[in-house]
Every structure is written in C-alpha cells, then in structure tokens.
C-alpha cells in the first residue's frame, strides 16, 4: 500500500517544510479515525524540530520525502516561535515522545500490536519491558536499529508480526528514509520516527523535568546532561538566521 495523502488541515510553510496546524487532541482523533475507517494505506507522521528543518533545507530529497508524510507536526518550541515570526502561527508544539505515548494509550484500549525498531538490543528490550508493564493490553516486538535501509530481514519479521504501529527510533534522516523505503510493503499501519524516545522509555536517558518542558527549554536540559548534544546546539542559531532571512524576504515581497 502507500501512505495516506496529506491531511486537509491548514498548512504552515516553515522553510519549505509543510507543517500541519493542528493540536495534540486533534492528532489523537485523527489516529482513532484512521483505524475506524479501516484504511489499507499507512499513516506516516513526521515530528519535526528545528534541526530536522535545517537538514531539510540543504537536502532536497529529504525535504520532498517528509513533505509526502500524512502529517508533519511541530516537535519543538523553536518551530512554533518561528511560525509566529513568519506571521503563520502554529497552534501548538506536539512533542514526538508525547504523541507516541498517546498512540500507545489508543493501542492499549484497542488491544493492538506495536513494533519498536531502533536503539540497541539491550535498550530496546528495556523499553519494551517498561512499556509492557505500563500497557499490558499491547503486544510488543522489537528489533535493533543498526540495519541498512535495504535490509529485508526486519521487514519480514514485521510482516509476520502484523503490528498496528511501527515506531522507528533511528534518528533523522534514517528513520524517515526507512519508513518511505518500506511503507509500500505494509498496510494499515501508523508509522512514525521517534528519535531517542526508546532510550527515554528504557530509562537510559531522562526526559527533562516538568519545569523545563513548561518553559519550553527542554533542549537546554538535554544538552546539559548529554555533552554529545552540545555540538548539535549550533543548529538553533542557524535555524534562527534562516527564519530571519525568510522574514526579510517576505517583507520585501510585499
């Protein structure tokens, strides 16, 4: 099958990435409706932060790939603030890990199946165990994320398992590339790249305390506890510069 066509929700163009102007509540309803309609297509969700948008601006193939997703939501306050600067305000930030958790709540109620693809075997198994304790009605399976895009072994395992959700935690761009490489081999799945969410659910990484999330500075906490991320912080001023440049271009066009 193929992915569901782009939703008919209002779009907000942030440096070429077509974000859906939606809320967490609306996304939950969209996912419920997808299963209720028994579509044979797949629902492909991208949760894009400033780093992903930056990458997309310099990698045309990736930009075109993610713009084929059923939904693109703003995972990061930087994207929401950018939308306001460009006078196209997005309604809400929708963190990928929280959207994944909302999917798991739906799966728990409906006794569905979830396939976790990503991280190491140890981390993946720990995430699966933790989630199984939280959501006992879900059937889980896991495979590590250290695979080539063309590897058919894991695809065959997924086909045999017949999950309702496939969460791919390989980091961008690989997770989205994997989804679009193989989505036509599946049907009726919710497919979403979830970055490092498996590490968080496994307890290998901590999510920022509530106060950091409330103040929309979760990225600062992540950098403080994981020095490997410091180098990635340079994407923020680059993103801000690109937004300022886009804003000036819009003003000149008026």
Curated annotation (Swiss-Prot):
The record's section on InterPro entries has: TAB_Glycosyltransferase (IPR053391), TagA_TarA (IPR034714), WecG_TagA_CpsF (IPR004629)
Per the record's keyword annotation, is rRNA-binding included, yes or no? no
User: Which pathway, metabolic or otherwise, does it act in?
Assistant: Cell wall biogenesis; poly(ribitol phosphate) teichoic acid biosynthesis
The reply to whether Glycosyltransferase figures as a keyword in the UniProt entry is yes
EC number, UniProt record: 2.4.1.187
Keyword annotations for this protein, in alphabetical order, are: Cell wall biogenesis/degradation, Glycosyltransferase, Teichoic acid biosynthesis, Transferase
User: For this chain's UniProt record, which GO biological process terms are given?
Assistant: cell wall organization; teichoic acid biosynthetic process
Catalytic activity of the protein: UDP-N-acetyl-alpha-D-mannosamine + N-acetyl-alpha-D-glucosaminyl-di-trans,octa-cis-undecaprenyl diphosphate = N-acetyl-beta-D-mannosaminyl-(1->4)-N-acetyl-alpha-D-glucosaminyl di-trans,octa-cis-undecaprenyl diphosphate + UDP + H(+)
> In Gene Ontology terms, what is one molecular function of this protein?
N-acetylglucosaminyldiphosphoundecaprenol N-acetyl-beta-D-mannosaminyltransferase activity
Q: PANTHER family attached here?
A: PTHR34136, UDP-N-ACETYL-D-MANNOSAMINURONIC ACID TRANSFERASE (PTHR34136:SF1)
Name the job this protein performs: Catalyzes the conversion of GlcNAc-PP-undecaprenol into ManNAc-GlcNAc-PP-undecaprenol, the first committed lipid intermediate in the de novo synthesis of teichoic acid.
Query: Which protein family is it in?
Result: Belongs to the glycosyltransferase 26 family. TagA/TarA subfamily.
> What is the protein named?
N-acetylglucosaminyldiphosphoundecaprenol N-acetyl-beta-D-mannosaminyltransferase
Q: Which organism is it from?
A: Staphylococcus aureus (strain MRSA252)
**Record lineage:** Bacteria, Bacillati, Bacillota, Bacilli, Bacillales
